[in-house]
Design a protein with these regions (language model features):
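Beta-propeller blade repeat segments, especially FG-GAP/WD-type strand-to-loop junctions
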Residues: 2-3, 10, 50-68, 104-110
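Repeat-based blade/solenoid architectures
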Residues: 5-26, 72-81, 125-127
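Short consensus segments that form the blades of beta-propeller domains
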Residues: 16-19, 44-49, 91-98
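Short hydrophobic/aromatic-rich beta-strand segments that constitute the beta-sheet cores
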Residues: 17, 65-69, 86-87, 116
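Acidic/hydrophobic-patterned starts of short beta strands in beta-sheet-rich repeat architectures
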Residues: 31-44, 81-88
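Extracellular structured ligand-interaction cores
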Residues: 37, 54, 99-102
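Long amphipathic alpha-helical scaffold regions
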Residues: 59-84
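Acidic, small-residue rich beta-repeat scaffolds with periodic aromatic anchors
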Residues: 80-185
Length: 185
């Protein structure tokens, strides 16, 4: 990686073999956070979950080195309003739909880094009946036995499906960036 870190979990042992086994890695150069400076986005699919990551670097003229602004599991989606949808690498629940837990990041220019502004998890009692004693039935207004736990800044929310869809639609109202990724060899 640009800062000298190794991108696979075995820390450099057998690099050629790891590279041969790995999924295609990719990069794009783009001003992803609208700060008028191009960033280097790198996607490493790797050979296993532990290798899979996406990075955002910016070159610091002052320090004459790359600065890491963001590091997360592979599969992020980048929005024109500056948000990053970042899917979790693992989950503690089972899902009957296409939901997967995720976090949302926004660039903090003062801190020169991306910070997590939201995290979302779904509890579907139909898929996980063992949680019935702890399920917040009073928050399940539509009665479908599905609730979304949302941490948004300092607020902790329990939303039923309609409320969650409204919240998500407002948050991700801007378009996805159409990024022209290139193979990293």
């Amino acid at each position: 990686l640009p800062n000298g870190d190794y991108c696979y979990v075995d820390n450099g042992t057998g690099f050629e073999k790891q590279k041969e086994l790995a999924y295609p890695n990719e990069f794009v150069i783009y001003d992803i956070n609208d700060d008028s400076i191009d960033e280097l986005l790198i996607g490493i699919e790797g050979t296993c979950n532990s290798d899979s990551a996406q990075y955002i670097y910016r070159f610091s003229e002052k320090k004459e080195e790359f600065e890491l602004l963001f590091d997360y599991y592979y599969g992020c989606r980048f929005y024109e309003n500056g948000l990053i949808y970042a899917p979790a690498s693992h989950s503690g629940y089972t899902y009957n739909d296409d939901f997967w837990p995720y976090e949302v990041y926004r660039y903090n220019e003062m801190e020169n880094m991306y910070e997590c502004i939201a995290s979302v998890e779904e509890l579907d009692l139909n898929a996980c009946p063992e949680y019935k004693d702890n399920f917040p039935f009073k928050d399940d207004k539509d009665g479908d036995k599905k609730i979304y736990f949302v941490r948004f800044y300092e607020d902790s929310l329990r939303l039923d499906e309609g409320e969650y869809n409204d919240w998500k639609e407002k948050l991700f109202e801007s378009d996805l960036f159409e990024l022209n990724w290139h193979t990293l060899s």
